[in-house]
């Protein structure tokens, strides 16, 4: 059997019925003819931003990571582990996919500790135990996992979903796809880069071609490639037929090399 596949969802996907339809149709079609274990992990940055704005709460970021004050973590947990997670679960059920909504702490699948005092309740994700998630997958259940973690002393932590996905893939010795509305990494002329390695990526970052949140995404992919010793795909959900190719290991976006 192929290695498990972790699909990290991001961008506007959670807000787009069209995107959800394409994704879950592709997943359903793929599962009909393939026995590969698939897991979904997600963030929900835009959903959090909308909620924070409605509540007149400040949105602060440092190096692409959200600063999460102690008085805000319950709101963010509700948005990610609650609303965003259950939206995805509802789409899975709509397409008759047997799924369960989880967070990083369930089954101790991903361990989390505080990343940086200045960031507040922002967690650093580390590999955990594969047993719980493997058992679910073996029963034909699709785990849908939010990027909310819990520390050993019981503190809720908001974890960058790209970094959480890396830790999850490491836990399961899985392949990793970073799926969003961004189809690929672009060069200085706006052209797709089909493959990129560490030195090339760092050069584009130093040149200001890769910026902001994309830096976190690329660094997460580079770290995942290093830890897993396998390439990582950055791709878009836009084309259903291409998604099926992607699930079978064919590069449709940018492949981050070891």
From Swiss-Prot:
Catalyzes the ATP-dependent phosphorylation of N-acetyl-L-glutamate. GO terms for cellular component: cytoplasm. Substrate binds at residues 44-45, 66, 158. Pfam families: AA_kinase (PF00696). The gene is argB. NCBIfam families: argB. It is found in: Cytoplasm. This is Acetylglutamate kinase. GO terms for molecular function: acetylglutamate kinase activity; ATP binding. Keywords: Amino-acid biosynthesis, Arginine biosynthesis, ATP-binding, Cytoplasm, Kinase, Nucleotide-binding, Transferase. The record marks 8, 217 as: Transition state stabilizer. The lineage of its organism: Bacteria, Pseudomonadati, Pseudomonadota, Gammaproteobacteria, Enterobacterales. Pathway: Amino-acid biosynthesis; L-arginine biosynthesis; N(2)-acetyl-L-ornithine from L-glutamate: step 2/4. Homodimer. It is an enzyme of class 2 (transferase). ATP binds at residues 181-186, 209-211. Coiled coil: none annotated.
